[in-house]
C-alpha cells in the first residue's frame, strides 16, 4: 500500500488536506478531526464519546461499501491526529529532543478497527522524573479511553541497543513512522536503523525467514486449518509483511509499488499481491467489527457473521463455505508468491558465488544449487507438457529440493496461459502415470504440483475442491488439503519408521500389486464433494473417465472406481456396525470380494481417518479396524457361504477361560455355578481373557452385591469397565451419566442380563484425548460407579457444560432401523448433535419404553454422534413398527439441538 500520509518531513498531512481520507470518504456524518477539538473536549468522557462515534462511523461506512483500505487509512489518520492533539495538550512540544513515533502495524499505517496502537516515546537522553511522569499520564489517558496501546519509552541509544539484540524490536524500528515531535531526532534514528551496522540484510533476511518458518510450524504449515488466523496463518497478512520488511531493509522500498521499481516484483505480481492483501484486509476489518476485543482468528462462531457482513449469499452454511473457499484460495496465492519472492531476495541478498555455474541435467533443465531451473525460459509456453517433465524429473532426482525462482515465475505465467488442461496432452498423461508409479510420487511431485496449482492445471476437477471447506468440527482441513494428507499418509506406509503407529498398514502396503492405483483412488475419493449428491458415487464415475483417458485396463479401472465408491465402507462397518455378528462380517466380505481389495481398502481407510483430523486416530479405532480386517480375511479364506459355528465358539471360549482360571487353582464348582447363570451370548461376545478376568473377581465377591472392575491394561484400545449388579430400570442411563460427568467417552457397550436378573455390562471408555483411562483416576471412577449402582431411585445425572464450539452447530436428530437377519433384535442407528449427557438421556428413553439394550457402538464425528444400538422389547423380541415409531418420536423430541441442555 502506498502511504499517502507521508509528507517530505514525515509528518501527517494537514486536516484540511484534500487527500485526507476522512474528508474524501462520503458519509452522512463524517467524524471531526481531533486536531479541531477544543480544550474542554480533552477529557476522558468526551474523548471516549468521540472514539465510539468514530468506530460506529467505520462500521457504517464499511457496510455501505467503502473499501477497507480507505477506512484503515482513515482510522490511522484519526489516531495520528488524536495523539498529536493530546501530545501538545500534555506540553510535550516544550520538551526538547523528544518525539512520538508509530511502530509495528501502526507504523505501517494498518489500523483495523481493533488493531493495537504501538508507539515509541523517543528521546535523545533519559527523561527527567517530571517528564517521565507526564508520559505516564499521557499513556494512562489512552488506556482509560480503552485504546489498545502498546508503548515503550527509550532513548536513541536504547532503541539501537535493544534493536540489535532483538529482531522483533529491529523490525518495529524499520517500519517506524513519525507522528509528532523532534523531526531531526527521528531522522537520526532512521539513519542508524538503515545503516549497514544495524541488522545488515545478510543477517536480517535469514532471521526473518527463520521467524516465518517457526510461525508456519505453529499453524501446522498450512493456511487450510478450518479456524485460520487471518494475520499469522501461512498465506496470511504476515507473509505479505515479511516481503515488505525484507524489501524495506534491503532496498529501502516502502511499498509494493516501489518493489516493482527495483525490479524484484513484476507489475502483474504487484497487482496480485495487492488484490490478496485487499481481500484479507476486508475479512479482517469485518471480523474486527463484530468482536468486542482484538483477535484475528476466524473461529467457527464468527464465520457466519463475517460472511453475512461481507454479503455472501446462500442458505444454511453456504455463505461461510463460499467465503472460506475464497479465503483459502487467496492464501494459496500469497504462499506461492511469498515463496518465490523470498527466493529471489535470497539470490539478491545472499548471492551465491558467481563462479558457481548451473549444472545441466538434460537439454531442457539444469540445477542451480539443489533447485531445478529452465535452460530456455520460454519452454513451458512452447511445450506445456514440459511442465510434467519437470515434475517427473523431481520425483526421480533426489538432489532436487524445489523449483528455482525464475522457473517458478515462468511456471506461474505458463499455467495462466494454457489453452486446455494438461491432461489433454498424451505425453503429459504418460508422465503423470509414471509419476504415480514412483515410490516418492507424493512428497516429491504431487505435493509441489498441488502447491503450485499444477494439479488444478492438469485436471480441472481438482480445482472444484481447492479451498472447499465443510462447516463442521469433524474435518480439520479443506478437501484438497485433506486429500494431499491422505496421499502423504499412504506414502508413509512404505516406511518402516511408520510401523509403530500403523503396524497393519506397513505390513500390507508392500504387498499391494499396484500402489499407484491406491494413490489414484485417494486422489479421487473426495473429488466430488461440494457438487451435491453422493460424492462417493460421483467420484467413482469421475475416476472411470480418468482411467479410460489414461489407458488403465478394465480390471484396474474397476478396482479404483470401487475404492472410491466404497472408501467409507470399512470405517462405517468397523465403527457403526456390530462386527462381532458373523452376518455383518459375511455381508462386508461379500462386498469386498477378495483379500487384495481388502488390503487396498484398509490402507485407504486408515489414511483417510488420519488425514481428516489428527485427533480422530486412536488405539480404539485401530483395534476396530484390525478386528474387522482379520475377521473378513478369515471369512474370505473360509468361503462366502461358510459361517462360523457359534455353539463351537461358545464352547471354545469357555474351555480357554477355564484353562486360564485353573492356573489360579480356583473353585471349579463355584465357577460353574456362576457360569450356569450366564446366557450363551455372554460367552460368544467376550474373549477367554475377559471371561476369566470377570470370573476371577466374581469368585471372590458376594455375587448378590454390585461389583465394578476396571482393567489396568488397555482392551481393544480403550479401558474396559465391567459392571455386575442387580438389573433394574435406568441402570444403563445411571452408568452412562456418571461416566459422562467424569468426562469419559463411552465407545462401546455390551449389555447382558444373567438368567437370574444380574446385569453383566461391559463398557469401553476413553479419556477426552482418545487415550485409555488414566491410572490415577481408576479408584475414583470405580467408587463413583459403585455409588450410582447402589442408589435406590434413579436420579437424572448432573450434566457437564456444553462446549462453546458445539453451540454454533445444528444437527437434526435422525433415527433409522437397519434391516436385520433376526426377529430377536432390532438394530437402530441414531444421528444427533453431540451434547453432554446424551447417552444417559437415550438410556432413560429406552427404560421409559421398557426396552432392553443389548449393545451399543458410539461414534463421535466432530459435533455429530452416529451411534448403533441393539434393542429388544419386553418380550426379548425385535421392536414392532408402532414401538419403533414411538421410540423415534421420543428421541427426536428429547435430542432436538434447539433444546437447552441443563447445566451443572
From Swiss-Prot:
**Which residues lie within the region annotated Disordered?**
1-23
Q: Name one Pfam family in it.
A: GlnD_UR_UTase
Which Enzyme Commission number(s) are listed? 2.7.7.59, 3.1.4.-
Q: Which HAMAP family match?
A: PII_uridylyl_transf
Give the family from UniProt.
Belongs to the GlnD family.
Function per UniProt: Modifies, by uridylylation and deuridylylation, the PII regulatory proteins (GlnB and homologs), in response to the nitrogen status of the cell that GlnD senses through the glutamine level. Under low glutamine levels, catalyzes the conversion of the PII proteins and UTP to PII-UMP and PPi, while under higher glutamine levels, GlnD hydrolyzes PII-UMP to PII and UMP (deuridylylation). Thus, controls uridylylation state and activity of the PII proteins, and plays an important role in the regulation of nitrogen fixation and metabolism.
Domain free text: Has four distinct domains: an N-terminal nucleotidyltransferase (NT) domain responsible for UTase activity, a central HD domain that encodes UR activity, and two C-terminal ACT domains that seem to have a role in glutamine sensing.
Q: What is this protein called?
A: Bifunctional uridylyltransferase/uridylyl-removing enzyme
Q: Which organism is it from?
A: Pectobacterium atrosepticum (strain SCRI 1043 / ATCC BAA-672) (Erwinia carotovora subsp. atroseptica)
